[in-house]
Amino acid sequence: MKLIILIIAVFFITSINGQSVSNLPIWDKQQATLNGDWLLSKNGSKSAIYITQNNKLVFSNGLVSRTFSLAPNGATVGLELLTNDQSFLRSVRPEGEVEINGMRLNIGGLTGQPIQNYLLPEWLETMKSDPSAFQLVNYAMTEVKARFPWKKRKEWMSKELPWPLPGKELVFTYKLNAAAITLIAAKYLKNENLEYLKAISAEVHYELYDGMPVFSKWIRIVNQSAAEITINTFKSEILAATESESAVDTKKKWELPNITVESDYNFGGMTNESLYRSSIAWNIDTLYKTQVSYERTTPCLLEAYPKYGPDQKIQSGQSFESFRIWELIHSSWDREYKSLEHRRMLRALAPWTTENPILMHVSGSQDEPVKKAIDQCVEVGFEMVIMTFGSGFDVENETPQNLDRMKKLADYAHSKGIALGGYSLLASRQVGGGDDVVMPNGMSPTFGNSPCLESKWGINYFRQLYNFYEKTGLDILEHDGSYPGDICISKEHPGHRGLEDSQWNQFQRITNFYKWCREKGIYLNVPDYYFLSGSNKTGMGYRETNWSLPRAQQEIIERQNIYDGTWDKTPSMGWMFVPLVEYQGGGDQATIEPLKDHLPHYAQRLANLFGAGVQACYRGPQLYDVPETKAIVAKWVAFYKKHRQILDGDIIHIRRPDGRDYDAILHVDPAGTEKGLLMVYNPLDIAITRTISVPVYYTGIKGAVKVQEQEDQSKISTIRIISDGLSDKATLTINIPAKGFTYFILK
């Protein structure tokens, strides 16, 4: 009888868009595994699906593979990093979970695994389907689709990047059968007719990208019944991962499995760590009774779910889609290597972050100062003007006079090849009138005060944003505070019903706008981690009051901020700040104006920033005041534009700035003509000579490297590379002038 059921189940799900499973290529792990380092390789393996000899489906690109059972139910039964033959899965769990009308339902999965420490293939043959779970009925594969439209601003990009990302999407469809509905009714003591559940399907979506060890996953619930349903909550990923360490004693900080997770449901911070407050958790696995931890507290169960709600009403004929997560499977614990893999993933998943315009923060929004800033930008090669905080720029002023004036300024800027926009404060302010967030007792808004985005004020504010940018043609918004994830228990706001749907609805409100901005080519500076929802840039990571310190101290701190911030960001993902005029105090000792009186310091700041490929908010009324100042600014802009591709590339960290000796970073781009650019700074009052081991592995250069000092064609030398894997190095002896710098181009 069991054999008959198994045969029926396999027969029922043996097609992909009508293609028989027998027509799929047979999985050969050894043949499929890609050799070489994906960070350096130009030709990544293509994503595809295969069938194993025992009818398991394999989704692989030669770097990683995820294996699925098809019967007696769908489930992830393998997750491997092929390049070092490492398994990341120890136990089978449901593919997801959804709570509909108060009933928690598993999507797929198998039960009956004898222990949770590891998974043997032969165990799968006797494991069973949960009879109350959604059952796999079909699967299909398509090309990866764009998450939303992106109007590329190629003038700010150093290289063309694809959108959508090349790869494949694999979709599994699950439904509830009559037996499951009977069990659900008994479990939840439901007397009403639950037949409508048969008309609800659960889709589990996966994406795998060509040439990257990255999977994406999300779920979609389709309501084809005649009834309205409520999605109370969900889990879009339940992954029982192999633990990275086992400890008997309880630890304050565990070594998590070597997987970096990203989510497009992320807010309230400038790094991806904030996702642990919004959408991701490494939880304790309560089924893992045989773990080493005495109190069984090893965090080795990856789960993706919103911390509140979403509590969404889904009408007949409509669907609900969860947020997406991405799982980067690492092959190394080396900090630089893991960081590079993460940065490469972000650049691919959010390619608009490679738009890196050279920008100025003009301190006034009236016609004269704005036009002066535009004209100066044209003269020295800057590409964008932002009417900064405190400038008087106001997107909430919808008077015909203001809209007309801003359109004329935008037209003027565009006629000169300059992008123009301004600053708007969203969070950290109180709007009153019952439109602020109402927090539960004992809780406060992230920034002390904040409007609810689903209040009348919030809904109108976003209407104003759409209207303002559509009518003026401005093409940059600096959106301060953004939405930090504040919940709201108000029952009076028109955009949400209460606590449980407040966070989800507010997030949808703001990210729908950000995605619209991407479609229109409107650049977004957002001091929050909204990259995967459309923002271009966030703060590199600095303390604002430091720009009130004496100028000499700012020089070192600036390079420290860049060094530290580029562990988890590319140079184009983070902005810095240059106070041309006083900012939060410090007086004459902190500011650069009058510019002509502080040329050495101004030049050093430009060298710090353009040498790192990092754009800053140069805040003030002007970029230059005399020809000598103009020449210095133009020199560094020209340097950046000449070497834009390599300077926009990833940074390898050599020596952190400490003011006591040299500091250095190495830009790398193995696909470029200039494969490396070494920037070295000397903060000391004396010239120094140093011998530096340059880590050239990430340049992709083998054998020997040609090194050119600055732009001097007569100073080219060939240096033998000492081969040592990730530690491949070329030894370089260099002279660095006092309070100066030098740079070297590697080919």
Predicted regions and their residues:
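Polysaccharide-binding surfaces and accessory modules of carbohydrate-active proteins
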Residues: 20-50, 55-58, 64, 75-298, ...
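Active-site-proximal substrate-binding groove within the catalytic cores of carbohydrate-active enzymes
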Residues: 59-62, 510-716, 731-733
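Glycine-rich, aromatic-flanked loop segments that form ligand/cofactor-binding clefts
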Residues: 119-154, 328-342, 405-446, 470, ...
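An acidic-aromatic substrate-binding cleft motif
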Residues: 321, 335-384, 388-391
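The substrate-binding groove and active-site-proximal loops of carbohydrate-active enzymes
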Residues: 356-367, 388-403, 443-462, 494-506, ...
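Hydrophobic faces of well-ordered beta-strands that scaffold small-molecule active sites
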Residues: 356-362, 385-387, 420-424, 477-479, ...
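Active-site-adjacent "subsite" loops/lids of carbohydrate-active enzymes
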Residues: 366, 404-411, 415, 419-474, ...
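C-terminal beta-strand-rich structural cap/linker in extracellular carbohydrate-active enzymes
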Residues: 722-747
